[in-house]
């Protein structure tokens, strides 16, 4: 256990200077890497592998026509080849995958990585970021943490902020000093997140609709238009209705389905190349892109909105990085996905080079290039592959919503873990049904691949542009590379993506308005929730009660201490929340052991159990008042209430036993009390300095029913060693136990609800009398039960506020609060043990 020292509650571990975790960068065995590469084909590449279903159809929708010179089809193939080569292969596989945040990827991972290397966080403090206020202690790497890292010789902890040369230092200072730039950074991350959510609506629609559209070549045209949309909607409804069962039961089929699909389209491509046009490889020359744009001009530029669909799903390589590793994703793409897609697109182009006559029922698309004898089996495989690709996008949307909720940027929703083995497999009921309704509405409303492609393309390219912008900052701030390299990265890839973005945006009235509207709605929800949460925290910060107020409570004020443990939730990691003073003022009593619990969702993926709990003491030890800060990463799974209660009590017991409490008391007594106006602040500073990291598992707590009986007398040693005469310790073969006394025989009318004993580590020294007395009182309180005091705040705009603030706070934020779930820690708390304290916050 670490000794009491200035500990930053927002920085549980030292970030790697490159953003990756050492555990993730360890080289895995070759067999395991290949197994992960195989699995990634079904999870990561389902969406990307189904893009040949609709790319040519979207590119030749109306903007350009297929002529006998083949310049159009060869130009489109050239654009497809170089887009696949430059964006997924060069940008993502070679560069972006290296910018992981402790093994995790995605837009928020890049944002969290940047915030840890510069004081640029504007996330709600209870949800993973500093409030951004001057002097706020909730920063990722404060001066105290830097001193501690330097004292421990940990250069890596300082490398995130201290090194990097003039360019990194200059960019860091620019971000830290200008709130506008910090807001721009947060807005970029939120825009990318909103577009990912929009992609979760559009990708299932276009993938399933395009797969089902193969029926147009197998039936009459007047019959097809009445069959295509109902079948697509039926498949989509089944897909969303099965989400709550999870994917672990059928997940083993995902990789074989995608592999079968990739082999199928690549073999069809080879057949078409050999049979129709072996010289189609000429289109791999960039010269054909120039010829294409020169001939088609504005029509060719607008057709780029359909061509960019060839890279839809590329962002999943980075977003799903946490489930695999960098090498496995690179192997799967370069060895299987990339060559299969190139062969598929070349095969379609080879077929179209020899088929120029456009009949009344003829459309350029994937299925026209499939030999008629195998068209039905290919149709079945295509539908299965589209379902797999859609499933991956839906799961990714759930994961993104979970990250936003954990970081305080989205209203709380119900998160169901569908697998006991894989923590990333989650299901969010509210989001699932919203996605289904929107997906069905778009499918029924558009009924056309062209409009669906325009909508999906804009969402895809916007996310990629956001990644490019954030990645250029990572190159400077986190990798400490030259600023010219960062400029080169953003200019090269930004120019390519801006070209596609402009081609998509110009089709606003033809479907591209959908992702913009969806992003605006989700962006408004996120901004309103973020604004209301920040204002609520600022009210807590400004109205918190000094520790001296709590220490001044004396028996003559009528304060009563009752048996048990009182667990008071607060979003503050220092001081006393205003809601507790409100509670004590109206009900002058609190428990014999009081724990102020602060749950922090920090902007890193995972917090190790050894660094999860921070424990400190408030006031003299006779008060039995503690503060506990529990830190979770945005991918951590919250435990159930019973397990959490045990770990919480054990962390306090370990704090008492290990000597950290004695060291904290000595540190407190050695400092003179400040009785001037700044005494409260000084006391809070001293208290924060006494916070200690408590590793889990040092002390185990055993609980038995009250009637289980006392241990035998020969197992009990030193029964009165505690000074109070109530505790006993038992020596075993490998551990020492401190037990509560046996329940008394018949005069006792009400037996304790449970008997508690702490099992100490085998090598631990015998605790002294003061420690035993404090542990004994903690055991007595645990036996009496634990009560949860939860604040229920109503946020209202204060009088004199502007109309806009009253609209946002009194109506929009209040509506979101009333329709969101309660905090995660409160979901499984027994209602009989919960006391809610209501208070109105005027902000």
From Swiss-Prot:
Expressed in roots, shoots, and panicle at flowering stage. It is a multi-pass membrane protein. One of its GO terms (molecular function) is potassium ion transmembrane transporter activity. GO terms for cellular component: membrane; vacuolar membrane. Residues 1-34, 94-183, 247-249, 320-326, 399-425, 473-482, 532-843 are cytoplasmic. It is found in: Vacuole membrane. The chain crosses the membrane at residues 35-55, 73-93, 184-204, 226-246, 250-270, 299-319, 327-347, 378-398, 426-446, 452-472, 483-505, 511-531. This is Potassium transporter 10. It comes from Oryza sativa subsp. japonica. The gene is HAK10.
């Amino acid at each position: 256990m670490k000794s009491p020292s200035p500990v930053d509650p927002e920085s549980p571990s030292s970030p790697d200077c490159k953003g990756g975790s050492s555990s993730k960068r360890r080289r895995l065995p070759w067999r395991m890497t290949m197994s992960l590469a195989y699995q990634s084909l079904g999870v990561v590449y389902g969406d990307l592998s189904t893009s040949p279903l609709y790319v040519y159809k979207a590119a030749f929708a109306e903007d350009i026509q297929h002529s006998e010179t083949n310049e159009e089809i060869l130009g489109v193939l050239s654009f497809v080849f170089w887009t696949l080569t430059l964006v997924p292969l060069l940008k993502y596989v070679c560069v972006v995958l290296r910018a992981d945040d402790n093994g995790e990827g995605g837009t928020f991972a890049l944002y969290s990585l940047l915030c840890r290397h510069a004081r640029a966080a504007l996330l709600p403090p209870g949800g993973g970021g500093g409030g951004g206020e001057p002097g706020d202690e909730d920063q990722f790497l404060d001066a105290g943490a830097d001193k501690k890292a330097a004292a421990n010789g940990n250069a890596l902890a300082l490398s995130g902020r201290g090194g990097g040369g003039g360019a990194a230092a200059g960019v860091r200072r620019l971000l830290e000093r200008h709130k506008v730039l910090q807001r721009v950074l947060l807005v970029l991350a939120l825009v990318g997140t909103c577009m990912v959510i929009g992609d979760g609506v559009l990708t299932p629609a276009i993938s399933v609709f395009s797969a089902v559209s193969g029926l147009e070549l197998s039936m009459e045209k007047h019959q097809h238009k009445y069959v295509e949309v109902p079948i697509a909607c039926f498949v989509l409804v089944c897909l969303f209705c099965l989400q709550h069962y999870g994917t672990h039961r059928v997940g083993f089929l995902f990789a074989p389905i995608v592999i079968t699909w990739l082999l199928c389209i690549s073999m069809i491509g080879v057949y078409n190349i050999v049979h129709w046009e072996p010289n189609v490889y000429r289109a791999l020359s960039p010269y054909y892109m120039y010829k294409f744009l020169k001939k088609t001009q504005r029509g060719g530029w607008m057709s780029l909105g359909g061509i960019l669909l060839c890279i839809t799903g590329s962002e999943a390589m980075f977003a799903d990085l946490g489930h695999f590793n960098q090498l496995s994703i690179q192997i799967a793409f370069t060895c299987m996905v990339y060559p299969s897609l190139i062969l598929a697109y070349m095969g379609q182009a080879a077929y179209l080079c020899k088929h120029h006559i456009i009949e009344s029922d003829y459309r350029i698309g994937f299925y026209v290039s499939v030999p008629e004898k195998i068209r039905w089996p290919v149709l079945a495989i295509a539908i299965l592959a589209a379902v797999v690709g859609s499933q991956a996008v839906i799961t990714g949307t759930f994961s993104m919503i979970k990250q936003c909720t954990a970081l305080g940027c989205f209203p709380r929703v119900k998160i169901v873990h569908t697998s006991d083995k894989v923590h990333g497999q989650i299901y969010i009921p509210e989001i699932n049904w919203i996605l289904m309704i929107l997906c069905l509405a778009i499918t029924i409303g558009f009924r056309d691949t062209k409009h669906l492609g325009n909508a999906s393309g804009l969402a895809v390219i916007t996310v990629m542009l956001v990644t490019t912008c954030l990645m250029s900052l990572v190159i400077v701030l986190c990798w400490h590379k030259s600023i010219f390299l960062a400029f080169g990265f953003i200019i090269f890839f930004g120019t390519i993506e801006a070209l596609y973005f402009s081609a998509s945006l110009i089709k606003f009235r033809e479907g591209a308005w959908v992702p913009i509207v969806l992003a605006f709605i989700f962006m408004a929800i996120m901004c309103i929730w973020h604004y209301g949460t920040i204002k609520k925290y600022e009210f807590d910060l400004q109205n918190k009660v000094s520790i001296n107020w709590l220490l001044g409570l004396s028996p003559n004020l009528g304060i009563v201490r009752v048996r048990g443990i009182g667990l008071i939730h607060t979003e503050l990691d220092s001081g006393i929340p205003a809601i507790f003073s409100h509670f004590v003022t109206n009900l002058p009593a609190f428990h014999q052991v009081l724990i102020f619990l602060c749950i922090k969702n920090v902007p890193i993926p995972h917090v190790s159990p050894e660094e999860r709990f921070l424990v400190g003491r408030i006031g003299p030890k006779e008060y039995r008042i503690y503060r506990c800060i529990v830190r979770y990463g945005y991918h951590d799974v919250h435990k159930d209430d019973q397990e959490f209660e045990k770990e919480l009590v054990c962390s306090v017991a370990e704090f008492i036993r290990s000597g950290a409490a004695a060291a904290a008391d000595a540190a407190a007594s050695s400092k003179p009390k400040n009785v001037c106006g700044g005494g409260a602040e000084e006391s809070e500073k001293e208290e924060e300095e006494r916070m200690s990291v408590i590793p889990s598992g040092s002390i185990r707590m055993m609980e038995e029913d009250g009637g289980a009986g006392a241990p035998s007398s020969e197992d009990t040693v030193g029964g009165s060693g505690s000074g109070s005469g109530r505790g006993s310790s038992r020596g075993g073969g490998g551990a020492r136990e401190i037990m509560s006394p046996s329940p008394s025989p018949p005069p006792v009318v009400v037996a304790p609800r449970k008997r508690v004993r702490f099992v100490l580590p085998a090598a631990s020294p015998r605790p002294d009398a003061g420690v035993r007395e404090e542990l004994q009182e903690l055991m007595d309180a645990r036996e009496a039960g634990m009560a949860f005091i939860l604040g229920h705040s109503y946020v209202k705009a204060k009088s004199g506020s502007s109309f806009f603030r009253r609209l946002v706070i009194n109506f929009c934020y209040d509506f979101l609060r009333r329709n969101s779930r309660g905090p995660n820690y409160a979901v499984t708390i027994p209602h009989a043990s919960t006391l809610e304290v209501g208070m109105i916050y005027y902000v």
